[in-house]
Every structure is written in C-alpha cells, then in structure tokens.
Amino acid sequence: MKILYDYQAFDMQTHGGVSRYFSELISHLPQNIKTDISVIETNNIYLKALGKEPAGTLYKNFLWHKDSAIKHFIYKLYYNIKNGDFNRLDHTPAINRFESIKQLKEGDFDLLHPTFFDPYFLKFIGNKPFVITVHDMIPELFPQYYACDDIQIIHKNITIPQAAHIITVSQQTKLDLCRVMNIKEEQVSVVYHGANESQYIPNENDKDFEYILYVGERHLYKNFNDFAKSCIPILKRHKELMVICTGKPFTDSERKMLKEYGMENRFKHRFVENDQEMLDLYHYALAFVFPSSYEGFGLPILEAYKAGCPVLLNHASCFPEIAGNAAIYFNMNKHKNNFEEQFETFYHLNGTERKELIKRQEERLKRYSWNKSAKLSAEIYQRFI
C-alpha cells in the first residue's frame, strides 16, 4: 500500500498544527506502508527534519548561483512553460503544486491524503480514492470572523463530500462537521492526535519571576482580550506574577489595550525557536491557560501535560473531551466569566493537591500516542484500497 500526501499544509506553514500532524502521522505509519510527499522544497521545519530541501534550492541551483533579474525572469518562464502554466508566466513557479499534479497524473499510489482542502487534485486523481482530515470547523461556526466568500469554506464544501472517508481529530469536530455539512456519521472516523514521545529534560530556568503562559494565536474566538481583562485583578493582587505570550508579536491594538489596562509591563511576548524551548516555557510556568471558545483538538494541552505544567481551560468545545479530569476548568463566554475565581482556587492549592493534578495529567497523556493515531489511520486507508 502506497499513500501520497500533497504539498498544501507544508506550503502554508513553516510550523504549526496541521503540518505537524501530517509529519507525525507519516513518521509513525506501520513499516508495510509506503509514503510519498509531493514536496520538492520547503521551509517547513518538520519536513526539513525529514530531509526535504529548503525553499529556494531549485532557484539557487538554476543556471548560475548568483541572483539577478534576468535569472529570475528565465526561471519563472522556464518552469511555468514546462508545467503548462501559461496564464502565470510572470509568477514565481508553484514548484510543489506542479510536483503534486505530476505525481497525481503518474498514478503511482493507492490512495491520496491531501493535506488541506484545495480541490485542485480532483481533476487529476482519476478513480483513486482519497481520505481527508478535518481539523476543526472554526470558519463555519464563527462566520462573523470570516468573509462570506472565504476560500477555505468554499474548498471544504467541494472536497469533503467527495472523500472516500473523513478523519476528524476529536468527537466534537465530528459532531460539528456532520451537523454543519450534513455528513453521515458512518463516513467519519475520529483519530486523536498523539503526544510527543521523545524524552523531555528541562533546561535550567533563567526566569526570576512567576508567570502564566498563553500559547498561540490571539484573534477573536481565542478570547485573548477577555483573558487579558480578567488578569487585571489577578496581577494587581499578585505583584510578582507576569503573563508570557507566544505566537506573533503583540499588535498595535493589543499594545494599546494592555496600556489602557495598565498592564503593558506585565504582559511579555516571547519568540520560541524549538520544541525544547517551548516545553521549558510550559515546565516553569505557574500554569498554562487556554481561554479559547473553540479548538479542533487543542494540542497545547498535551504539550503542557508532557512538561508537567498545570492546565486551566475554558469549559468549551472539545476541551473536556481531550483533557478529562486532568485540568481546572473555568467559563469565559458572554454569559459567564469566572476565570479570576478559578485561578485563585488553583493558586491556593497546596503541594499535595498540585501533585495530584500533575499525576492526573500524566495519566491522561498516556491516552494519546502517534503510533496509535498512525495505526488507526492505516486501518482507514486499507478499507478504501
């Protein structure tokens, strides 16, 4: 059995949940399954770790090594004509897309697992089956944050109904998918993410202050603004406490908001270079707080569990499904916000109670394995070949 994975997620992300999911899945599949990834060059950190060339290699080695306008012009002309993209002769060639189409036409695979929802492959796949993974239904459930002609929604409505089978990463996502898109339940299987199985050894802590950790994006449904506002009385009460945020730097509007709250010096942004650094941030945090209204799975929960970091979660979406009794829950919605109260309850746990919480997290983490995820995915592939 040979599975073809296309380029989409790896062109979209240098790192991140979707591309990490596919790199872990591919790396953990049973040995009797052959795989191919239709990517020639990439800046995705997970694929580079698997030996793929960095983006720009093809251009660098084209004709002569020195960059120039004439070299760039000939490069675009050559590869676009070579791949029949006559309407885009002045565009930088979509090298990985061309490679995907080439491999689809050659047909040397048994099943395609596209890594996102662009339906470009449908006219090249012939009678070969494809399986697709739905990571969340955020654009459909929060349309107020997306354009009415959002391309992801359009692509999902074309691609998903034509799949031989659909994988979702949580039961919550399956329920949302079936309800919103009128998909039959038997067409969908739930395959959870796995946890990073490498040994984690903390580096020495260089922080001389306690901090709450916020991880990832901060746009609207993530509830960052409400979280920041809820932190005001907490930070005033606990003078030594800070909030560290990863992800993109604070926007102008976020900096303005924090300044209005008098909290601009209590919220710090931190760039994270690698998994070790991220796990260290979790490990030395007082707690990891995830106030989001909706996630497809919530991979940072498992990261925090692995690092031995107490987890506080909004009681929403798939969080109770994934975290079980190994987290402290609060409500942060338009009807109720008791984050401050629940944080103070956590803050005043004694040593024994905190150890019990961490022990529950360690036990919960054992449920999530990339080997198990890959085995279940392989069984799904086999059903449709």
List PLM regions with ranges.
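Carbohydrate transferase catalytic cores enriched for Leloir-type hexosyltransferases
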Residues: 1-385
